[in-house]
Amino acid sequence: MARGCLCCLKYMMFLFNLIFWLCGCGLLGVGIWLSVSQGNFATFSPSFPSLSAANLVIAIGTIVMVTGFLGCLGAIKENRCLLLSFFIVLLIILLAELILIILFFVYMDKVNENARKDLKEGLLLYNSENNVGLKNAWNIIQAEMHCCGVTDYTDWYPVLGENTVPDRCCMENSQGCGRNSTTPLWKTGCYEKVKMWFDDNKHVLGTVGMCILIMQILGMAFSMTLFQHIHRTGKKYDA
């Protein structure tokens, strides 16, 4: 009976972590594709030049893939050492997430202030040769979100010249429209637009966050339960 429960739990955890591992592989693949095809796409911050969309997705994908692999191997081998490692990794990730969320809300005003300042400094690199990714990112976000600059369109004046903005700031986009002072422009800054997007989608984001939290807790529960079952049935392991 105990052995049957152990087998059932083992394969449930293996399947759970196999899905986890496949998701990690998918994220890693997307990150590598972004890195190869888009270069430094979405590198907005001059203070953190490595914090691009590609690098972020690669890092998350790698963590998810390694964690899933630990869980799969620990379950199928019934190895208490690997199961404990899997539990500790998930616990560290969970604690790191909670600490980051708490710090974000405690220092929200400071985060907003520094983010705006850093993004404005990043605009100065818009036309530099080594920052094509930053230029692409700003062009896309301004066109898609109907915004201009960080706080408003005047953020571009010190970068491109008086009364000059990127063409994607124009309500009716056309070649050279950003140099025409009479062209209607998007007035709202992109920072405010992004904040509005997060506010409009907070329920969806909250649901996604809750699902991730539940998956992490389930993974920890599966690993500890399997760990205890192996211990009770006297299963030995290789350290």
UniProtKB/Swiss-Prot annotation:
- One Pfam family name is Tetraspanin
What's this protein's family per the entry? Belongs to the tetraspanin (TM4SF) family.
Q: What's the source species for this entry?
A: Sus scrofa
Query: Which cellular components does GO assign to this protein?
Result: plasma membrane
Which keywords are on file for this protein?
Glycoprotein, Membrane, Transmembrane, Transmembrane helix
Q: How does it assemble?
A: Found in a complex with GP6.
Q: What is the lineage of its organism?
A: Eukaryota, Metazoa, Chordata, Craniata, Vertebrata
Q: Residue ranges, Extracellular compartment?
A: 35-55, 107-203
Q: What is this protein called?
A: Tetraspanin-9
